[in-house]
């Protein structure tokens, strides 16, 4: 099986520049998903997910917006190794279902509405603790509530998701899986509300999850990845080190340590950790990707000229990306002038608005082309060829 760019334009483009337009499933190296908050209503958030699939130099991107995206996720992600999926992609694979079905499950569990839960959110209430460890029936009940909480969280029903996790914690208060789900939910709410206090509570929940003596290595490494995304590199590194010390290491932990080392500009450690990730790789595609990362950062570490070129490329890429965002905002500022000119029948105001928007959009188009050209790394062979010449 493979992914193929359909349509006449991708076909013509691949013919013109000789690029591939087909990617085998076995050649997928990375799957990353971004969540964009498109609208907020009564405590609930409407997410738009964008999943990027990379391999063999190709990038396929899919955006959510209906049942087609859910079918694509269900068909594409389950056969892939967890190593090549980021946290959010794993969540989508395991918990993405129709929002209407999720709401029906919440109603069946008598979980109150988001408006009611939001009014009660933050109030201090005593949480009963079980006198004895949960039995098999109670643990199964806690697992169901945890799954429901994750489904509600992925669908954007964040207050109801937090309530589902709270009920699961009443049954099994020390479970790392439940605490991890609750922490992820609190982090999402904190990002939506821009609440630093709630963000600290999310980090505290992640730290509580780390105390579970039953915690699995994969859960521990996923918590480390979440802590790194929450801008807590010290806690993330501690979690990844625990995976190494207690479980012998795994791919996600080694990759996470490499990203932390890269953040600190420690190229030798980056190379070391990507080499470890290569040893933990379960698929040829993952081994190929990690081997490429080792070669790339080794070239950066050994060749100052190549390092300077790449630093210049990244700095220029960041500058163009900032100009692209600014030009788009300027283009949007021109639309009110266009509307005012049309409403008051003043062609001068309308023409000024059209000029501002048109020029800004042209600049945005040029910046977008520049960003795409600079996104790819400079091949090291070009530097070697110049040195030989």
Task: Give names to the regions the model predicted.
Residues 2-72, 90-94:
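Non-transmembrane, membrane-adjacent beta-strand/coil modules in membrane-associated proteins
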Residues 61-155:
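Terminal and domain-flanking low-complexity segments
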Residues 144, 178, 219, 253, ...:
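TPR alpha-solenoid repeat register
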